[in-house]
C-alpha cells in the first residue's frame, strides 16, 4: 500500500515537472527553437491541424526558423497562421520554404517573460506540494484504519517529503536555466 502511494506520488510529480518543461519550451527566447511553433494550428481542408502535421520546422540559424511545407498549396495558409499567432512573427516565403526571422527581445519583453516563467514554476511547485498533501492524507487514512503502524506512516511521510524536495529542486533548476537563457542577448 505504501509503495503504491509513493509510486503514485512520483508519477504525478513527474507529470507536473513535464508539464512545466512543455510550457517553458513554448516561451520564446532569443534563440530559434522549432518548439516555438508547436502551438500553431493551420486551416487544412476545413479543419484546424497542428503545424507539425503539415510542415517540417527546423532552426536554420540562431535567429531564423525554416518551415518546409509538405503541400505547396498550403504555403499561404501556413504563412497566415504564423502571422496571426500571438508570437509577433513575420514570416516570408521563398518557394516551398517559409523563413521565420525572430526579432531580438527587448529588455521589457524579457522581464515580462521572466515573470511568466516564474509564475509557471510556482504553479509547478504548488502542484508538487498538492501531490504530497494528497499522499499524506492517504497515509493518515491508512493509519486511522490501522492498516499501517505509526512508524511506517512517519517513514513514508519522510520519504514523500524527500521526493517532494527533489522535485521542487528540479523545478527551481529549470527556472534558473530558463531565466539565464532569457537574459542572454
UniProtKB/Swiss-Prot annotation:
Q: Name one GO molecular function term.
A: ribosomal large subunit binding
Q: Which InterPro entries match?
A: Ribosome_recyc_fac, Ribosome_recyc_fac_dom, RRF_sf
Protein's UniProt keywords contain Cytoplasm: yes
Q: Which GO terms describe its cellular component?
A: cytosol
What keywords would UniProt list here?
Cytoplasm, Protein biosynthesis
DNA damage is among the record's keywords: no
Its BP terms in the Gene Ontology are:
cytoplasmic translational termination
Instruction: Provide the protein's localization.
Output: Cytoplasm
Question: What does the sequence similarity comment in the record state about its family?
Answer: Belongs to the RRF family.
PANTHER family cross-referenced by the UniProt entry:
MITOCHONDRIAL RIBOSOME RECYCLING FACTOR PSEUDO 1, RIBOSOME RECYCLING FACTOR
Task: Give the function comment from the record.
Answer: Responsible for the release of ribosomes from messenger RNA at the termination of protein biosynthesis. May increase the efficiency of translation by recycling ribosomes from one round of translation to another.
The name on file for this protein is: Ribosome-recycling factor
Species, as recorded = Tolumonas auensis (strain DSM 9187 / NBRC 110442 / TA 4)
Encoding gene, per UniProt annotation? frr
Amino acid at each position: 500500500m505504501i509503495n503504491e502511494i509513493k509510486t503514485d506520488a512520483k508519477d504525478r510529480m513527474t507529470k507536473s515537472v513535464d508539464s512545466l518543461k512543455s510550457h517553458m519550451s513554448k516561451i520564446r527566447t532569443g534563440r530559434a527553437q522549432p518548439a516555438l511553433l508547436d502551438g500553431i494550428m493551420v486551416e487544412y481542408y476545413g479543419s484546424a491541424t497542428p503545424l507539425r502535421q503539415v510542415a517540417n520546422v527546423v532552426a536554420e540559424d540562431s535567429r531564423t526558423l525554416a518551415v518546409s511545407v509538405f503541400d505547396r498549396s498550403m504555403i499561404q495558409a501556413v504563412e497566415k497562421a504564423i502571422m496571426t499567432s500571438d508570437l509577433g512573427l513575420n514570416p516570408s516565403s521563398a518557394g516551398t520554404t517559409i523563413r521565420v526571422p525572430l526579432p531580438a527581445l527587448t529588455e521589457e519583453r524579457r522581464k515580462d517573460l521572466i515573470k511568466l516563467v516564474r509564475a509557471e514554476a510556482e504553479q509547478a511547485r504548488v502542484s508538487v506540494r498538492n501531490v504530497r498533501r494528497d499522499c499524506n492524507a492517504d497515509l493518515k487514512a491508512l493509519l486511522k484504519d490501522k492498516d499501517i503502524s505509526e512508524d511506517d506512516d512517519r517513514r513514508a511521510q519522510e520519504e514523500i517529503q524527500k521526493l517532494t524536495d527533489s522535485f521542487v529542486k528540479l523545478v527551481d533548476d529549470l527556472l534558473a536555466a530558463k531565466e539565464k537563457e532569457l537574459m542572454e542577448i
